[in-house]
Amino acid sequence: MKIRVGVIGCLGRMGKKILNELITNTKVEIAGAVARSGSKYIDSDIGPIIANLGIKVTSSISGIFESSDVVIDFTTKECMLDCLKAAVKFKTPLVSGTTGIEGVDLKEYAAEVPILWSANMSVGVNVLLKLVKKAAELLGNEYDVEIWEMHHNLKKDSPSGTAIELGKTIANASKVDFQSNQYLHSGSNIRKKGGIGFAVSRGGGVIGDHSVMFVNSDERIELNHKAIDRTTFARGAVQAAVWLYENKREIPGLYSMQDVI
């Protein structure tokens, strides 16, 4: 029996990619697709989006959670909060890649239902996180750490969720407090010893570039990841949904792509 997957935010760039990945994955089938209330596609077949499958676009988040085995969300903080409440109500596992969610206590909801959240669903970025963690453990606090990221000119959150996750990974591995040691470059102040610096660029249609640098007076170690196509995020999200349903559907908890790979 195939896993029934619901998609929240089906008209967005990521939503469309995820729908396309779902129709090519033999383990899953599309349970339903949600768009924002007021969209001209509500009650229309998702055919114009991907393919004629006899599935209509809806604005009912609760309805999708009730009819799905697992739900994937790539939307906004406000919509994600509605998804979290619906996930708890219907005990439906949730996979989310929504960023800019400061102040949301995922652990509170994960105590009642399986939730997998990652700032970046790309397998490559999650390998980068493992490499960065190992580098930080080996190098300790003797190297300055700089994280640079670039995204398209419409991205709202800054630094990106992935950049912040990289910073937190380094802080944990180096045994320092992330909140008190992070800073975004501005003004003319000298960099803080042991600080984790962030630099941000926005322009054009860049999907996502991330670079982590460990620098001292003698050398620089640089680890990079560049996303070529958003398909990498969609494929990772579907992989995460399958993993969450097959392995943790009855085990509430907060999971990430680090668990999947």
Swiss-Prot record:
It is an enzyme of class 1 (oxidoreductase). Coiled coil: none annotated. It comes from the Bacteria. (S)-2,3,4,5-tetrahydrodipicolinate binds at H152, G161, T162. It catalyses: (S)-2,3,4,5-tetrahydrodipicolinate + NAD(+) + H2O = (2S,4S)-4-hydroxy-2,3,4,5-tetrahydrodipicolinate + NADH + H(+); (S)-2,3,4,5-tetrahydrodipicolinate + NADP(+) + H2O = (2S,4S)-4-hydroxy-2,3,4,5-tetrahydrodipicolinate + NADPH + H(+). Its EC number is 1.17.1.8. Pathway: Amino-acid biosynthesis; L-lysine biosynthesis via DAP pathway; (S)-tetrahydrodipicolinate from L-aspartate: step 4/4. Transmembrane segments: none annotated. NADP(+) binds at R36. Belongs to the DapB family. PANTHER family: 4-HYDROXY-TETRAHYDRODIPICOLINATE REDUCTASE 1, CHLOROPLASTIC-RELATED, DIHYDRODIPICOLINATE REDUCTASE. This is 4-hydroxy-tetrahydrodipicolinate reductase.
